[in-house]
């Protein structure tokens, strides 16, 4: 996880690497998590709702046998490192804050195996 501050604004970025011989179950978890991130990004369109993002992520994760970590979530970024809104990785389509053009937030899906 890496963050920089530029002209008073924060960033938040991360990368994950698998090193050595990774158990197939762990590789699958990593692959599905990346798929969920991509699905969440696709759902995060102007005029959609944050619940649309969470629902899309949750549906794909559960379809693949994983459960969503509900205690941690994505978040807004700006002049503070963690700002509103909370971007949960579960939810109901059509609920939550409306996504407006220009909003900046993270999508950080995390799952339990099982």
Locations of the language-model features?
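Active-site neighborhoods and metal-handling regions in enzymes and metal-associated proteins
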Residues: 1-114
């Amino acid at each position: 996880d890496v963050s920089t501050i530029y002209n008073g604004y924060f960033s938040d970025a991360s990368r994950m690497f698998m090193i050595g011989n990774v158990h197939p179950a762990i590789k699958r978890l990593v692959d599905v998590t990346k798929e969920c991130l991509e699905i969440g990004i696709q759902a995060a369109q102007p005029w959609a709702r944050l619940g649309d993002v969470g629902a899309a992520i949750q549906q794909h994760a559960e379809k693949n046998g994983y459960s969503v970590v509900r205690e941690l979530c994505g978040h807004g970024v700006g002049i503070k490192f963690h700002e509103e809104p909370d971007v949960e990785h579960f939810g109901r389509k059509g609920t939550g804050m409306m996504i407006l053009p220009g909003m900046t937030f993270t999508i950080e899906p995390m799952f339990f195996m099982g």
